[in-house]
Amino acid sequence: MAISLQKSTVVKVVGVSLVMLLAACSTDQRYKRQVSGDESYLTAPGLKPLNAPSGMILPVQNGEFDVRTVNSQGAVGKQLDIRPPVQPLTLLSGSRAENATDTSKLLLENSPQNRDLWAQVTRVLQDHNWPIASRQDASQTLTTDWIKWNRADEDVQFEGRYQISVQEQGYQLALVVKSLELQQGGKTITQYSEIQRYNSAMLNAIIEGLDKVRADSESSQASRKVGTLDVQSGSDDTGLPLLIVRAPYAVVWERLPAALEKVGMKVTDRSRPQGTVSVTSKSLSSSSWDALGAKDPELPEGDYKLQVGDLDNRSSLQFIGPKGHTLTQAQNDALVAVFQAAFSQTSATAIK
């Protein structure tokens, strides 16, 4: 009985220790920021001058092979943050980003598409429930209150205040995010890399929100548009065959899944920013083709990739077959009448 009790106690102690160890591991996120491996290089002896024995003739010294002593200052070993800089998202057409010490800037074309940029930016902040300390619509500038970040690679989370503005710069519009103050655990952070990391994180969050706002608007407009879309055969810059649809990208994107379903192609995955659609094609019965009013293109069954291109007021559709090759010219031409009929019998889809 005493032995059994002792074993039970040992099991409980081991169990509690294991739980505590796992809990500690689950909250310690340093492994995501630190280099792993041997750190013996930190204690390696420094370089010393070569002392040749008396009478030995050494080769002529060549400066190209000198290993110079460099007194560098900065974090080393476990103190070195190995995370790469946050890169700006390229979700908005024609955009490019610039970074300075405490400022991240997104440059966009000063076009009708970006006419309502300021209103869209303020909507994104409201959708995120981010606190706004002050706002001046006349100058298109606002200042946020403290925004708390929640990153899985930080033990102690950061919070920051930002100034966000939209500025006209000639033929461009600039969306500017400026860091006013960054804190971690109540302590002010002045390290450039951290300020830039969270500045870029703020800019990317706004970019994602803008992309969603615009996608929702385009989807709403496309869902109200029905009717026949003109489809023609064409080719890309390298001469490979594709389909040309005389409708904007947003309209084609929303109506495409239903049209694909109509011709026996089931959508398995799609990405609007990349314009890619994955489908699985299965043969239809002759009665289905008769109902569609088109001739069977006789495509082999299997998985296809579809690349959707944005050509302003037109769109392109290029199919890549199961073996990784584009369709032949004959196969592509056969799909013209097929998709002409499919688009005429379908409207926008609810698939996202």
Curated annotation (Swiss-Prot):
GO biological process: Gram-negative-bacterium-type cell outer membrane assembly; protein insertion into membrane
Membrane topology according to the record: Lipid-anchor
Domain of life: Bacteria
InterPro entries assigned: BamC (IPR014524), BamC_C (IPR042268), NlpB/DapX (IPR010653)
A GO-annotated cellular component: cell outer membrane
Keyword tags: Cell outer membrane, Lipoprotein, Membrane, Palmitate, Signal
Localization: Cell outer membrane
Signal peptide: 1-24
Pfam families: Lipoprotein_18
Claim: Cytoplasm is one of the keywords in the record: no
Lipidation (N-palmitoyl cysteine): C25
Lipidation (S-diacylglycerol cysteine): C25
Family: Belongs to the BamC family.
Subunit structure: Part of the Bam complex, which is composed of the outer membrane protein BamA, and four lipoproteins BamB, BamC, BamD and BamE.
NCBIfam families found in the cross-reference section: PRK11679.1
Function: Part of the outer membrane protein assembly complex, which is involved in assembly and insertion of beta-barrel proteins into the outer membrane.
Record protein name field: Outer membrane protein assembly factor BamC
Species assigned in the record: Yersinia pestis
The gene coding this protein: bamC
